[in-house]
Amino acid sequence: MDISDIGRKLSLDNNKLLIRKAAEIRRLCDAQFDSSIIGVGEICKAVICLEIAATRLQIIFDRQAAVKLSGMSEKAYSRSFNSLQNVIGIKIKLNVRELAVQFGCVRVIKSVQNVLSSYKERFLASLPASRRANADFTRPVFTAAAFYLCAKKQKLKVDKLRLIEVCGTSESEFSCVSTSMTDLCFDCVGISKEKKDAKDVKGNRDLLDVLPGKRRLEDGGYSSGDESSCYKRHKKMEEAKYEDWKSTVVNSIKKNPEKGTKRVIQASLNFPKKSETKELQVDS
């Protein structure tokens, strides 16, 4: 399907500049790699190229209609969109002020700028001198993580999934950067005055009890290698039940040793033997 046909289905066919830009991005994708390797079909690739072009030209783009047209789920579409952008080397420029206006959190602008400055300084200080020159803080995931943590600090609601979508990253990368930023800039974005262990926080303790083997570093969550308290209690209860049953059986055998030690022998079964058949010969 041609780019112009997809643009017509998304009501974007009137913008000739957008169609030309999307076609240019599609040719760049075809020249650099085979999109089928990352599971992106031709129609989905054309839709994603249109969205990338619309983003760069600051044109309003209906992502819901695009996801429906691509034939993929929203999560799979976002993953393919991010992969395609990274492969062709197109970087999203994320401005703190535009982000604050978009999410309605204008009062966090100054805080976000301070957190980004402190994080960069402290992160570079933790690196060896040979690696400091290669550190890249221009990626939008750092701005998005600082914005989210500052909004959370000031108890402002921000749609996390939408923010991840805007900055063009994955949930795992966003969570990793948020955790690193919280550790290095806890005085700026920390919720409490001091860090607490996961077992001391009721909400986190309940989460660890439910999923002892599948813990994620999400909002307020912490990972731990120890077994949860609920699992330990359950294990102790099972052991106690087993010990009670074992003591009951042992006491029963002590009271009736003959009954307990007597072996049960299966009676032999004697089936009647079949009568031997004799062949009858007829005299001719």
Swiss-Prot record:
Coiled coil (residue ranges): none
Tissue specificity note: Follow a cell-cycle regulation with a peak at the G1/S-phase. Mostly expressed in siliques, flowers, flower buds and mature leaves, and, to a lower exent, in roots, leaves and stems.
Localization annotation: Nucleus
InterPro entries: ORC6_cyclin-like_2nd (IPR054113), ORC6_cyclin_first (IPR008721), ORC6_met/pln (IPR020529)
Main location: nucleus
UniProt GO cellular component terms: nuclear origin of replication recognition complex; origin recognition complex
Sorted UniProt keywords: DNA replication, DNA-binding, Nucleus
GO molecular function, one term: DNA binding
Annotated GO biological process: DNA replication; pollen development
Gene induction: Regulated by E2F. Accumulates rapidly after cell cycle reactivation by sucrose addition following cell cycle arrest mediated by sucrose deprivation.
Assembly mode: Component of the origin recognition complex (ORC) composed of at least ORC1 (ORC1A or ORC1B), ORC2, ORC3, ORC4, ORC5 and ORC6. ORC is regulated in a cell-cycle and development dependent manner. It is sequentially assembled at the exit from anaphase of mitosis and disassembled as cells enter S phase. Interacts directly with ORC2, ORC3, ORC4 and ORC5.
Primary role: Component of the origin recognition complex (ORC) that binds origins of replication. DNA-binding is ATP-dependent. The specific DNA sequences that define origins of replication have not been identified yet. ORC is required to assemble the pre-replication complex necessary to initiate DNA replication.
Family that this chain belongs to: Belongs to the ORC6 family.
Record-given protein name: Origin of replication complex subunit 6
Gene: ORC6
